[in-house]
Amino acid sequence: MKKVAVIGSGSWGTALAQMLTVHGHTVRMWARNASTVAEINERHTNEKYLPGILLPQALTATTDRAEAL
């Protein structure tokens, strides 16, 4: 298992992050929007880009690029 950073929380970034967690990796995703980060971390969803998809607990988000990396 590796720790992976995904830069961007749009549909592609969120789908990639989800796929990586499903395959056993811990993923920290960078997002520029604080409300998106809160939604991902608190509700484990990103309804704007992947409606109806529950994101894994191993996927977290931050607005801090250094923290993501």
Which residue stretches match the model-derived regions?
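A short, aliphatic-rich alpha-helical micro-motif
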Residues: 68-69
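NAD(P)+-binding Rossmann beta1-loop-alpha1 motif at the extreme N-terminus of oxidoreductases
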Residues: 1-53, 61-63
